[in-house]
């Protein structure tokens, strides 16, 4: 680890507190002991970044110096399955030198992260954003949960699809973009890639209660893993055909994985979600191989259909 990165990590996390947080047995995690995707591999290092330059979700909100619920869960998963996690909200960590110390970057973020708004934590610089995208294209893994698609929005109207060349470079990388969401509700995830890591034991799909994002601007090369089943869902945001909710894609040499799940705190300890997440992590860091050909036209052929724009009352 570089001296620059090491000193920053020491500044961000008090080691005595880290030992307490990393032993968070009181979380009641629904760990999947049969999911062994990290054995016989070098210990991977993941940067979990959760700055909010906009709405801050309760699952990533810290209480003083105490780590957030999602941070604790990811750290505990790492401890159990054999990967290291550095959790921060400090955008100054994004430099070319610092990113060399990680195998993957995990975003649970909102807004324009170069702006010092929202949670008031130090923002990423413009150069830091460039360094992030360069690192991914050069081979670093990237993972995004929930509001990672509500980050660095593309210019243009909310209820219109933007051409690829007009999408923000970050949106081009992650492969989709948030429009809006309806009320929290139980909804069905349909498995579109049964052989993707972490998905094998989920059968044809599962149901889970969460806040569900309506998404647009899908990359044409998405390998769709889970599909949002919209039939029966409450809210005009879901008056559209089924669309991708979890996917994988390559960005240059980098492996990109995203799931729209993760708003609710109880989702983070749900065994199905953890199975999906661990499979995505293992693939993104290169521990496991998986065929990820584009399949969006088969898995969700009408995904680009935008829901109706709400009428003003």
Residue ranges and their predicted role:
Residues 41, 168, 172, 176-252:
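Catalytic beta-strand/loop cores that center a nucleophilic Ser/Cys/Thr
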Residues 47-50, 86-87, 104-109, 141-145, ...:
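Structural recognition of the beta-strand scaffold that forms the well-ordered cores
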Residues 1-14:
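N-terminal secretory signal peptides
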Residues 42-43, 70, 80, 233-243, ...:
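Extracellular ligand-binding/catalytic regions of CAZymes and related secreted enzymes
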Residues 12, 38-101, 295-312:
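Aromatic-Pro/Gly-enriched surface loop or interdomain linker
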Residues 112-201:
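A glycine-rich, often tryptophan-bearing local segment used as a flexible ligand/cofactor-contacting loop or short
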Residues 14-23, 29-31:
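N-terminal export leaders
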Residues 52-55, 91-94, 111-114, 142, ...:
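Solvent-exposed loop/turn segments at secondary-structure junctions
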């Amino acid at each position: 680890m570089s001296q620059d990165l090491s000193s920053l990590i020491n500044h961000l996390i008090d080691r005595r507190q880290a030992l307490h947080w990393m032993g968070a047995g009181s979380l009641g995690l629904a760990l999947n002991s049969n999911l062994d995707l990290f054995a016989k591999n070098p210990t991977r290092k993941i940067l979990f970044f959760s700055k909010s330059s906009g709405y801050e979700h309760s699952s990533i909100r810290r209480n003083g110096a105490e780590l957030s619920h999602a941070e604790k869960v990811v750290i505990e998963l790492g401890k159990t399955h054999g990967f290291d996690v550095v959790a921060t909200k400090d955008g100054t960590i994004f430099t070319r030198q610092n990113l060399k110390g990680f195998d993957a970057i995990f975003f649970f973020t909102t807004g324009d992260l170069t702006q010092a708004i929202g949670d008031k934590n130090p923002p990423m610089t413009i150069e830091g954003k460039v360094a992030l995208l360069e690192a991914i294209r050069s081979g670093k893994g990237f993972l995004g949960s929930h509001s990672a698609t509500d980050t660095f929005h593309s210019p243009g109207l909310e209820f219109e699809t933007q051409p690829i060349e007009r999408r923000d470079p970050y949106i081009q990388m992650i492969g989709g973009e948030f429009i809006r969401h309806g009320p929290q509700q139980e909804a069905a995830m349909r498995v579109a890639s049964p052989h993707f890591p972490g998905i094998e034991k989920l059968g044809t799909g599962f149901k889970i209660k969460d806040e569900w994002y309506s998404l647009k601007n899908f990359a044409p090369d998405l390998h769709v893993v889970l599909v949002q089943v919209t039939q029966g869902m409450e809210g005009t945001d879901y008056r559209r055909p089924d669309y991708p909710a979890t996917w994988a894609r390559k960005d240059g040499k980098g492996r990109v994985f995203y799931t729209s799940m993760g708003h609710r705190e109880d989702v983070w300890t749900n065994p199905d979600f953890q199975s999906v997440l661990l499979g995505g992590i293992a693939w993104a860091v290169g521990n496991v191989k998986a065929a990820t050909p584009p399949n969006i036209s088969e898995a969700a052929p009408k995904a680009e259909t935008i829901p109706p724009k709400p009428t003003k009352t």
